[in-house]
Amino acid sequence: VPCPIVELRGYLAACGLKGRLYAYLDYNGPTGTSRDSVAEGMLALAAEKHKLLPGQPIIEAASGSFAMALALAGRTAGHPVVLTMPEDAPALRQEYLLRLGAQILHSPAQRGLAGARALAETTAAEKGWYYMNWLANDDNPEYHRRVTGPAIVQAISREGRSLVDTITVGVG
């Protein structure tokens, strides 16, 4: 489902600037966050590059919106999803992720996210699972180059001519 592009008419004027400013609203996926399209796209790229094999378990150090999106995308694509997180991660979040079909492995609370990442990396190596490592994975920006950027340019075009001068994105 294409994501809407809206013009933020009052923002530039309020800042005393000229031009036009648009926002790409990537919320049409099942979790309602921009992470849905990223998780699906990264899984597709990993499979295309034969880094992710059919039915291969996926492991990731995450507990937020990307974890939710990955749990759904992985299950839909036929991959078990295992999430690593510190043992003191919020119980309600863990329960939600379990209901989405993910499995959870805990790392020591005192090691924080670094401990969860180390557990994911070690487990992937030992068991032959695919470690997504989404924030450091080149498939993340590649997905946006292939899909998000062209979608924005196409949406903000007139008579086949792009009206886009600059694209600014948030990271994280």
Regions found by a protein language model. Name each.
Residues V1-G172:
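PLP-dependent amino-acid enzyme catalytic core
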